[in-house]
Amino acid sequence: ADAEQYNGAQDALVKGRYDTGFAALDALATAAADDANVAALQTFYANATADAAAVAEHGARLRGLSPTLADAVDRAIAVIDEAATETIDFAPNTDGPRTAIVVLGLGLDGDGNMTPELVARLRSAVAAAERSPESPIIVTGGNPQSGITEADAMQRWLVEEGIAADRIHSESTANSTVQNAQRTTALAAEIGIENMVLATTPSHLRRAISDFEIAGSDVIGAATTNVDDVPDLPALAPTARLGMTVDATKILGIPRTY
């Protein structure tokens, strides 16, 4: 496919400029009919615009080009649609050391200090850790400020709050939710984790669950400081899932640019 045209299509789609993006993809599909990435993008973004007929059309063409990628796209779309609408369990049944409590990082200030929002995530993780005392905690986040990564700051805070240092596992290189999901999934596999509970800002939960599930994790619920007063998380309409869709294309390895 023509690189300039492909890159232009991607730039439009990630910003939600669908008419421009779809027109560019349609032209690419004609000029480079064997490019499975183009068909995958058409399928993903047709789903993001709730165009079921186009999802079926582009999905069928993708399957003819790459059954493996088609399977991955179909699974990712199913995950997106479920994560966008499911009732999130804030008091999941954990499985001791096989369930990890995962805290997603958030940008530090210039001196390496945590924001109140990140501290709130950590407080919910501590509450979950008290309810599941055998579960390890994974902190994930890079983005260093003054030589301190998000994971460093979170680990230090947890230890100061009385969490045993050997209970905490650190992933200190991720710079996005996509990387949080990919790198934490890999770390969890290394330490024998079978499922996880996510600790993040409520408004970020649906996207985070989608990313982690697409990356291969089994997310069984979310952390909260009070299981009797959980956040109200309305479902996301089909056309409100752009961020989840963009993330899914990255996790599947569909190039952002050619």
Which functions belong to the PLM regions below?
Residues 238, 242-258:
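Low-complexity, Gly/Ser/Thr/Pro-rich intrinsically disordered linker/tail segments
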